[in-house]
Amino acid sequence: MRIIVSGGGTGGHIYPALALVESLLKHEPDSKVLYIGSFRGLEGSIVPKTGLDFKQLHVQGFSRSLSLTNFKTVNLFIKAVKKSKHIIHDFKPDIVLGTGGYVSGAVLYAAQRLRIPTVINEQNSIAGVTNKFLSRGADRIAISFPHAANQFPKDKVVLTGNPRGQQVFEKKGDFSLTEFDLDPKLPTVLIFGGSGGALKLNSAVVNFANRFSEQKKFQAIFVTGRKYFDSVSNQLADLKINSSNFVVLPYLDNMDDVLPKIDLLISRSGATTLAEITALGIPSILIPSPNVTANHQEKNARQLEERGAAEVILESDLSSAMLYHDLSELLSHKSKLESMAQAAKKLGHPDAADKLYKLLVQVINERKQETTK
């Protein structure tokens, strides 16, 4: 297969794309893959490390208010579409996959104009503006939440799940919590506010750190985010927190290794995180970010809450006392954790990347049949 993959801006668009590529190369090792990203997004630092062929476009998002920058945005989009057409013409893909972000809008729109088969992967329960715009010309839309189905043309929608779920589900390794000087036998909570950290969550955790460190029934890995690490460390030092059951880190580079070893996750509710924890069956306390388009993180989180897989605390309601009460209640009641874990697993798609790969093959074959009629 010759495929162009495009998705950018955040890890939530990039990692599902890379998970699909991993599945593709497992099934068809001789496939040719070209990844097209933007100059502004994280893909510029992530994708080249994978060894994939990588090209970049100049794009930017629209301002939600009337602004002269939107004229520049339109101009950049037109230029990006034109450049995408040249790239597509030279690469000659069998299909183009978009996983979200403004850059995928330009690439998929160009592919559709050139009558190249296109598939959209929508990771959230609330569809992004770019994916809604592209759905009319797409061959299929692969969704991760059933709730997203009614936002696209019905005959094009396929529930595959988020490819990232399979990648973390299949991760093999001999990692142990002893690497953090923790006891593998104790119930463990991972507190993670995302790659950038979450200020209010960090404050809540710091405020209950003393109580947490005094009990010895369970343990925590607290990931602050790099920009908050020094501040949090200083606050904990002032409180004289230095406990063997409370590990503080700026970031986790080996999240795939750590997730299977924990009993509870406290985190934001981005699509990639939810794909990971449902594939693995991890109970969670979710604190949706209020700073996202269309409040999609809360919508994502409610999908798990409704099925008994997670508890949801809105950031506006978050307090140190509430969070400590909820996590200690869950970690103290194994039967409740097991029930939530089973509910999470039922929502998971541990074969999502393979499902998406098969969908791509199906679309390519359908287009071939159409051209031979």
UniProtKB/Swiss-Prot annotation:
The keyword Cell division applies. Its EC number is 2.4.1.227. It catalyses: Mur2Ac(oyl-L-Ala-gamma-D-Glu-L-Lys-D-Ala-D-Ala)-di-trans,octa-cis-undecaprenyl diphosphate + UDP-N-acetyl-alpha-D-glucosamine = beta-D-GlcNAc-(1->4)-Mur2Ac(oyl-L-Ala-gamma-D-Glu-L-Lys-D-Ala-D-Ala)-di-trans,octa-cis-undecaprenyl diphosphate + UDP + H(+). UDP-N-acetyl-alpha-D-glucosamine binds at residues 10-12, 124, 195, 297. One of its GO terms (cellular component) is plasma membrane. CDD domains: GT28_MurG. Cell wall formation. Catalyzes the transfer of a GlcNAc subunit on undecaprenyl-pyrophosphoryl-MurNAc-pentapeptide (lipid intermediate I) to form undecaprenyl-pyrophosphoryl-MurNAc-(pentapeptide)GlcNAc (lipid intermediate II). HAMAP family: MurG (MF_00033). This is UDP-N-acetylglucosamine--N-acetylmuramyl-(pentapeptide) pyrophosphoryl-undecaprenol N-acetylglucosamine transferase. It comes from Oenococcus oeni (strain ATCC BAA-331 / PSU-1).
